[in-house]
């Protein structure tokens, strides 16, 4: 999928932008805090119906403005044009349309425009809690498996209902409790199977890319951990119902799954240096891109690279440049404060690129070939 052009109105600090884009490499240059990341986030929004950073939709509307609009025209592999529109006013729900027709459910849109976003905040995958790593799995799998989205929604609904029963002062209805436990188990087993299969396929891709970037300096891996590995999920959930009642929430289930990130036999969060951590998450995201490219056979994902070169040594930067300049990558958006990094990528490219200068939310074409 190729984003041909994009129009943005009142999205964060971008008051107005109307840009024609390169089908290969698009570079955005500017100081920190001028709007480069906000531009990438607007592209992300058109793929996922939400911001990568702001959980509340109204937070993306520019200050002192009452509405925002993002509209993009995409070209698929058959050269069909897909028009994607999102508009929202403060205090009302957003409108999301494909070719002028509004979606009944936003989940119907997920996966149409596969995308991987690599940003400095990705280090939270190593440093943060397990919810960040579960979200990583959810975001990728949801882009190629609609049944996963449905199972995840059903599981979370059942979990919420069971937790509400656990919090009750009086003794909850056992029959009702069992209904929600069965719903959790049924959907949870499906989520476990799909996560397990995804991680199994992702590991060799991830290790290969990490070796390329690091120059074979370290051995890394991933380990998926789930309560489903202890036996049938329904048994695991019901086994400690008394403890769950005492704390007021569900202690077991796939909502507690984790994706352990390892260097050698140790957790990255304890052993990894700053450069190793950044290399790890970058390789992980690029492996997700490669996985989606192989899995979603009808289209190549968009790749957003936000300030990825900071805190990496020259050898790793060179390896990344070599990697993303290859034929396996489709349309790429790259931001940086340092023009030198981008020039090296452009030198390796086939010459099809555009450079945009960003300042104070204004985005202007600086150069194209």
Give each language-model segment a name.
Residues 44-56, 287-295:
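Post-Walker A helix-loop "phosphate-sensing" segment adjacent to the P-loop in P-loop NTPases
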Residues 306-308:
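Walker B catalytic acidic pair
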Residues 124-214, 225:
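An accessory alpha-helical subdomain
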Residues 48-126, 130-132, 138-144, 148, ...:
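Nucleotide-state sensing region of NTPase/ATPase domains
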Residues 1-31, 175-186, 190-302, 311, ...:
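Conserved NTPase motor "head" modules and their coupling/switch loops across ABC/AAA+ ATPases, GTPases
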Residues 36:
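Conserved lysine of the Walker
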Residues 72, 331-338:
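Structural recognition of the conserved hydrophobic beta-strand(s) that form the central parallel beta-sheet
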């Amino acid at each position: 999928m190729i984003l041909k052009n994009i129009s943005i109105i009142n999205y964060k600090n971008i008051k107005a932008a109307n840009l024609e884009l390169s089908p290969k490499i698009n570079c955005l240059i500017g100081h920190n805090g001028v709007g480069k990341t906000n531009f990438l986030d607007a592209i992300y929004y058109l793929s996922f119906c939400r911001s990568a950073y702001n959980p509340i939709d109204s937070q993306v509307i520019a200050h002192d403005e009452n509405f925002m609009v993002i509209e993009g025209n995409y070209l698929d592999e058959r050269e069909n044009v897909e028009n994607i529109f999102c508009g929202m006013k403060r205090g009302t729900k957003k409108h999301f349309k494909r070719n002028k027709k509004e979606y009944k459910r936003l989940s119907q849109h997920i996966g149409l425009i596969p995308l991987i976003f690599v940003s400095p905040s990705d280090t939270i995958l190593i440093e943060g809690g397990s919810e960040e790593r579960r979200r990583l799995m959810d975001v990728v799998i949801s882009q190629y498996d609609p049944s996963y989205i449905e199972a995840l929604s059903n599981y979370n609904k059942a979990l919420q209902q069971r937790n509400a029963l656990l919090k009750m002062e009086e003794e909850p209805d056992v029959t009702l409790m069992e209904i929600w436990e069965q719903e959790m188990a049924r959907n949870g087993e499906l989520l476990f199977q799909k996560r397990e299969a995804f991680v199994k396929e992702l590991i060799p891709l991830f290790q290969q890319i990490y070796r390329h970037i690091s120059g074979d300096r370290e051995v890394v891996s991933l380990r998926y951990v789930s309560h489903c590995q202890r036996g049938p999920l329904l048994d695991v959930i019901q086994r400690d119902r008394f403890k769950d009642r005492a704390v007021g929430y569900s202690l077991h289930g796939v909502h507690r799954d984790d994706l352990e990130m390892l260097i050698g036999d140790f957790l990255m969060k304890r052993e990894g240096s700053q450069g190793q951590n950044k290399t790890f998450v970058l390789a992980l995201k690029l492996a997700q891109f490669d996985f989606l490219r192989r899995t979603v056979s009808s289209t190549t994902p968009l790749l957003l690279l936000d300030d990825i070169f900071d805190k990496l040594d020259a050898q790793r930067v060179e390896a990344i440049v070599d990697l993303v300049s290859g034929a396996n990558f489709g349309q790429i958006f790259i931001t940086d404060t340092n023009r030198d990094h981008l020039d090296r990528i452009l030198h390796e490219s086939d010459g099809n690129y555009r450079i945009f200068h960003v300042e104070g939310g204004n985005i202007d074409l600086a150069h194209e070939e």
